[in-house]
């Protein structure tokens, strides 16, 4: 997250490699430059609207609540049009309402954008609520794998992560 930049500029950063200009276009702000910049603004705003952030597009990213900052990070990542999105403990530091919103956001990412999400997370409610298949590691070793129902009822997983 670029905390000193405004929200829309954070998403535009993810779009930078998709739009190219010639030296003359960027130097003299020729019509094609303005057209490409407008396209980038429109695409950034479209991504922000998907995540309910269009109303804060001109706010500094640092001024957003923590949950919205996470959504912004995901929107910026999606601007690069990935096939795989790796989220490393995205719910860390979130309150239950923010975690619920994050679950909805991840579902949008999977369904609307067709992106595979690889999630590293300790929040079992989040994991069981959105994951289709789990791999559970304990001290770097595979402890269990399977559907959330299978894994979360595995006695070894319960002992290691949920307590006996």
Predicted regions and their residues:
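Glycine-rich phosphate-binding loops of nucleotide-dependent enzymes
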Residues: 1-164
């Amino acid at each position: 997250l670029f905390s000193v930049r405004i929200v829309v500029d954070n998403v535009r950063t993810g779009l930078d490699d998709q739009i190219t200009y010639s030296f003359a276009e960027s130097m003299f702000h020729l019509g094609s430059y303005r057209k490409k910049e407008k396209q980038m603004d429109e695409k950034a705003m479209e991504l922000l609207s998907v995540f309910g952030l269009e109303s804060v597009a001109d706010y500094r990213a640092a001024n957003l609540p923590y949950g919205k900052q996470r959504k912004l990070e995901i929107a910026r990542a999606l601007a690069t049009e990935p096939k795989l999105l790796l989220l490393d403990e995205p719910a860390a530091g979130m309150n239950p309402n923010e975690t619920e919103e994050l679950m909805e956001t991840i579902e949008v990412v999977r369904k609307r954008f067709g992106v595979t999400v690889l999630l590293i997370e300790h929040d079992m409610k989040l994991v069981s609520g959105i994951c289709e298949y789990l791999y559970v590691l304990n001290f770097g070793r595979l402890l269990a794998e399977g559907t959330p129902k299978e894994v979360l009822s595995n006695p070894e997983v319960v002992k290691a992560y949920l307590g006996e």
